[in-house]
């Protein structure tokens, strides 16, 4: 197993990793009053899948063995060790909610995946896409990493970066909306990690005195356009036309 995957797994347990998921769960706002069928495509360590499996029927699709071997499994969900081939085998209109977080940047068949995600989503269902945001990555490189050269490179016409998962091709929310077409209505856009990833003072992040006010700040700023534009991630929620 590569050390980078293991280090990434450890990172998501840190306060700055947990806050990412705390924001997502708040923004998704999935009610536990009704049991929903949820698909998490590109589930990674299955943190999101496991969270919702406590009250819902969840299928987690993840082809990377290194990642799913380190998955969270406190609750019961179905793990499918596959990718788009499994997606194509799912009957249409199967899921109430489809989740695809930080996946499309790393694939060459973005449009094909989106076609399949739309297909398996029930009419009236919700599609949740989390994506890297170019402006946020520029801030992160220039401020947190003290690497203005990389920040300059990100502002070039070629918005491609190397990562542990291969090339990361950052795309815009407008591109995503265009890919999905008229069948999917954009209902909301949130920012994630506008502030908490800019400080290298990690020691303070283990305290409630930092964590709770920072989470409140991130939550408030996530709906404000000025901060969505510079957040490290954007979270787009679409509704399939009934």
What are these regions (language model features)?
Residues 45-86:
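Class I SAM-dependent methyltransferase SAM/SAH-binding core
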Residues 165-183, 189:
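Short alpha-helix
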Residues 111-126:
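A short glycine-rich, Lys/Arg-flanked "PGG" loop and its adjoining helix->strand segment in the class I
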Residues 1-33, 47-51, 67, 128-154, 200:
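Conserved class I S-adenosyl-L-methionine
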Residues 88-97:
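A short acidic, Gly/Pro-enriched loop at the edge of an enzyme's catalytic core
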Residues 97-109:
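A short SAM/SAH-binding and catalytic strip from SAM-dependent methyltransferases
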Residues 188-242:
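A C-terminal cap/extension of S-adenosyl-L-methionine-dependent methyltransferases
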């Amino acid at each position: 197993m590569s050390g980078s995957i293991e280090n990434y797994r450890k990172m998501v347990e840190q306060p700055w990793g947990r806050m990412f998921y705390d924001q997502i769960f708040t923004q998704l706002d999935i009610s536990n009053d009704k049991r929903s069928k949820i698909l998490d495509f590109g589930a990674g360590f299955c943190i999101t899948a496991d969270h919702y499996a406590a009250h819902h029927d969840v299928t987690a699709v993840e082809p990377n063995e290194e990642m799913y071997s380190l998955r969270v499994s406190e609750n019961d969900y179905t793990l499918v060790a596959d990718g788009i081939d499994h997606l194509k085998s799912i009957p249409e209109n199967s899921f109430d909610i489809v989740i695809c977080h930080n996946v499309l940047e790393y694939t060459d068949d973005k449009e094909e995946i989106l076609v399949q995600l739309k297909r398996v989503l029930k009419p009236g269902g919700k599609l949740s896409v989390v994506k890297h945001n170019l402006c946020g990555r520029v801030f992160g490189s220039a401020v947190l990493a003290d690497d203005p050269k990389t920040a300059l490179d990100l502002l070039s016409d070629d918005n491609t970066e190397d990562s542990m998962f291969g090339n990361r091709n950052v795309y815009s929310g407008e591109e995503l909306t265009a890919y999905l077409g008229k069948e999917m209505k954009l209902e909301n856009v949130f920012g994630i990690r506008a502030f908490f990833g800019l400080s290298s003072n990690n020691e303070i992040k283990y305290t409630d005195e930092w964590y709770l006010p920072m989470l409140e700040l991130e939550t408030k700023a996530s709906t404000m356009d000025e901060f969505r534009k510079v957040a490290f991630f954007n979270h787009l929620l679409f509704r399939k036309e009934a």
